[in-house]
Regions:
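Thiamine diphosphate
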Residues: 2-28, 271-423
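Glycine-rich phosphate/diphosphate-binding loops that line cofactor/substrate pockets in enzymes
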Residues: 45-50, 89-99, 118, 245-252, ...
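Glycine-rich, anion-gripping cofactor-binding loops and their flanking helix/strand elements
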Residues: 103-186, 190, 273-304, 315-319, ...
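Active-site diphosphate/adenylate-binding microenvironment
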Residues: 221-302, 421
Length: 423
């Protein structure tokens, strides 16, 4: 993060447009520098840092224009460094043949490839918050595990969790049933040091484990197939159906950014696991701000990018659409006129719900996009959605999917969850 600042000498003097913004991100960044001039020794910290956010606060003083010298600022050269990890990975020992591997959406920062390799060697059922990165994951686990009966039938001996699970209460309820929990997350060495588990690893360990028994695998397959049958039978242009169809029809080799709140949870639950798509999401504070800008930044490095946003996420970052770069990104905006996730939570129906939680805006996202010079259309059917996903992504476009009301969606989800008790 680069921030522009007034000279330090003006701080705490009441000077205009001057505030305390040094170390504004606190311990959330790996490195901070308060840069007070063109000569600053940044090569050393840049070469030695682990991956993570960096904050450079750059002080600007008069004169604002360069002098007569053509080269008034030396180039910063950051050479690639190779660090040898002298510590051998620890070994994970387990006699369990009824184990489960649970993979959080961000994988604790570990690469998809390394986690896939680990999962294949382990040979346990996989629950993945990002089913588009793990084709061997159990389909729709967060849906059928809403049933307490099914959770009781699938109590594991051991669960291994990679990263953090932040999307579904059903998955977290399932995790609590396991007598032994193993956590793998590099962030425990930095920002997540209080994480509780029976065993903790900050890197993928060497495995000394047993494969899952055939009977255990068959149990998971049974519930996944029964749940998939129910999901395949869903009709209409609902948020669940949209998530299912987006996952199934994204072009091979495309990139997907998915916003927080309901979109990422619907994809987790209703998408059929597959490969061929590179997925991204903001799972730090999981906010709805900055999602357009994040998607466009990702699209700069991708051939064709799709971004799935809720209407509030879209409205909170409209200025991100003001750009001068050539970017290929198709935004699919799920429009239910407000914060749909809150209608699925216990506070639904309390006094003042709409003004505090629902926050309806009564705006037309497509009209707003057009006013900003962006190509925009509105769709209301699965066929139109499939057509959108098959079309080449050229430039920036907005496709607004108008869906049933937030209450209707919440009732539909509740009915789906309740039906899991009888599959």
């Amino acid at each position: 993060v680069l921030t522009a600042d007034r000279p330090a000498i003006l701080r705490k003097t009441g000077a205009n447009q001057t505030t305390e913004q040094a170390r504004i991100y606190g311990k959330a960044v790996r490195y901070f520098a308060d840069i007070d001039g063109p000569v600053f020794p940044m090569e050393l910290p840049f070469d030695s840092l682990r991956s993570g956010p960096v904050h450079l606060n750059v002080q600007f003083d008069e004169p604002m224009l360069p002098d007569d010298s053509d080269k008034w600022l030396d180039e910063i050269v950051i050479s690639a460094k190779v660090f040898e990890n002298r510590a051998k990975p620890s070994t994970l020992k387990s006699d369990s043949n009824r184990g489960v591997l649970v993979i959080g959406h961000d994988r604790g920062g570990l690469s998809v490839e390394s986690v896939r390799k680990f999962a294949k060697e382990l040979g346990w059922p996989i629950i993945a918050e990002d089913p588009l990165s793990f084709p061997d994951a159990v389909a729709h686990a967060s849906i059928f595990l809403t049933s307490a009966q099914i959770r009781a039938a699938l109590i594991p001996q051991t669960v291994i969790v990679i990263g953090r699970t932040t999307l579904s209460r059903s998955i977290n309820a399932f995790l609590k049933l396991a007598p032994t929990q193993v956590v793998i997350d590099p962030r425990m060495a930095t920002v997540d040091g209080d994480r509780h588990a029976d065993k903790r690893f900050t890197q993928l360990p060497v495995l000394n484990t047993h494969k899952a028994s055939p009977e255990w695998l068959e149990q998971w397959d049974k519930y996944a197939l029964r749940c998939a049958k129910s999901i395949d039978a869903l009709t209409g242009f609902t948020e669940a159906v949209i998530a299912k169809e987006i996952a199934a029809n994204l072009p091979e080799g495309s990139t997907l950014f998915v916003s927080s709140s309901r979109p990422i949870r619907d994809l987790e639950g209703f998408a059929t696991p597959r490969s061929g798509v590179t997925t991204h999401a903001n799972r730090g504070l999981a906010g709805i701000d900055g999602n357009i800008s994040t998607a466009l930044g990702i699209a700069l490095a991708s051939k064709q990018t799709f971004a799935v946003l809720g209407d509030l996420s879209f409205l909170h970052d409209l200025t991100g659409l003001i750009h001068r770069e050539e970017i290929n990104c198709s935004f699919i905006v799920i429009n239910n006129d407000g914060g749909g996730i809150f209608s699925t939570l216990p506070q639904r129906g309390v006094d003042g719900f709409e003004s505090v939680f629902g926050t309806p805006h009564s705006l037309d996202p497509a009209a707003i996009a057009k006013a900003m010079g962006i190509s925009a259309t509105t769709i209301s059917s699965v066929d139109e959605l499939k057509k959108t996903l098959k079309a080449p992504v050229k430039g920036i476009s907005i496709v607004v999917a108008n869906v049933p009301s937030r209450d209707e969606n919440a009732d539909s989800l509740k009915a789906i969850y309740e039906s899991m008790n009888s599959i």
